[in-house]
């Protein structure tokens, strides 16, 4: 009986390495009360810090988010948008693929991230970003709302994190008239904290006021906002609404070349970023280039 030698076993084959980077778009909401703003800061809890940490854990490689709006400490968001670049070979093992036919591609990842994130920040949706997409520089406009209550008792406890107590009468007609003077393309230096190398020229596209009982709401939209601009606009207009300033005063502020100290900035917790608009996919790249040129000008 002859013995035949079995051929040696082939060494196990490693899966092929997937080259390149995948850009993901993330739609995000957060309660800004306990955050020191969006941007990562050493020794401070921030929205970007919590999200970066969760994504880095899941993808097992350092990643960093870029957001459409870098909100200040205490400011909330229900419609923040960010993007993150992930190595393509980090995606396959980041989350289970089991799911139902027709489910969105990243639904399992969305569910897994929900277990890694604290209750005051949520990723609402994840999609593959189209070519040319940049969460910050491709954006056409940002929409904010500012809410305050003129009730004599302040704000009901369930809403106190999101509405500013303002138990004084406000003349919304005067505020609306003053707001009209601020519309359009202007240098808003009087309403912006100085940031080295940053322009303060902005296109203010909407600034209007409405009242429902004791709830007063401002809707504010612009191509972009400089640091603290929305709360400064609200603070100045509140001075007009209380008749401490004339309706023409805000127009005069537009002639200033630096930040004004003639009004108080409205409290952060009344402000929420609710939406970011983008152009059609085939215009994303060109919008990106135009915005970079304007912001560096």
Swiss-Prot record:
The keyword Iron-sulfur does not apply. Pfam families: PseudoU_synth_1 (PF01416). This is tRNA pseudouridine synthase A. Formation of pseudouridine at positions 38, 39 and 40 in the anticodon stem and loop of transfer RNAs. One of its GO terms (biological process) is tRNA pseudouridine synthesis. Its EC number is 5.4.99.12. HAMAP family: TruA. One of its GO terms (cellular component) is peptidoglycan-based cell wall. The active site is at 72 (nucleophile). Substrate binds at residue 144. One of its GO terms (molecular function) is tRNA pseudouridine(38-40) synthase activity. Signal peptide: none annotated. Homodimer. Belongs to the tRNA pseudouridine synthase TruA family. It is an enzyme of class 5 (isomerase). The keyword Isomerase applies. Keywords: Isomerase, tRNA processing. It catalyses: uridine(38/39/40) in tRNA = pseudouridine(38/39/40) in tRNA.
């Amino acid at each position: 009986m002859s013995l035949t030698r079995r051929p040696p076993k082939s060494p196990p084959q490693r899966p092929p390495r997937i080259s390149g980077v995948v850009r993901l778009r993330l739609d995000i909401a957060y309660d800004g009360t306990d955050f020191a703003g969006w941007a990562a800061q050493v020794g401070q809890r921030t929205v970007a810090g919590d999200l970066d940490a969760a994504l880095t854990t899941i993808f097992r490689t350092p990643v960093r988010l870029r957001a459409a709006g870098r909100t200040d400490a205490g400011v909330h968001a229900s419609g923040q948008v960010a993007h993150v670049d992930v190595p393509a070979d980090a995606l396959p093992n980041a989350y289970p693929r089991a799911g139902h036919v027709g489910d969105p591609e990243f639904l399992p990842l969305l569910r897994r991230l929900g277990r890694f994130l604290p209750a005051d920040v949520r990723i609402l949706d994840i999609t593959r970003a189209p070519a040319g997409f940049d969460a910050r520089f491709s954006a056409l406009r940002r929409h904010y709302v500012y809410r305050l209550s003129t009730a004599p008792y302040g704000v009901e406890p369930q809403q106190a994190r999101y509405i500013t107590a303002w138990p004084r009468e406000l003349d919304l007609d005067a505020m609306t008239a003053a707001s009209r003077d601020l519309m359009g393309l202007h240098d808003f230096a009087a309403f912006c904290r100085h940031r080295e190398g940053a322009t303060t020229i902005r296109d203010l596209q909407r600034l209007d006021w409405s009242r429902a009982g004791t709830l007063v709401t401002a809707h504010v939209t612009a191509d972009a906002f400089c640091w603290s601009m929305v709360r400064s606009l609200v603070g100045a207009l509140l001075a007009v609404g209380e008749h401490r300033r004339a309706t023409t005063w805000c127009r005069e502020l537009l002639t200033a070349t630096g930040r004004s100290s003639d009004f108080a900035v409205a409290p952060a917790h009344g402000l929420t970023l609710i939406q970011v608009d983008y152009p059609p996919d085939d215009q994303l790249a060109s919008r990106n280039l135009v915005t970079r040129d304007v912001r560096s000008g």
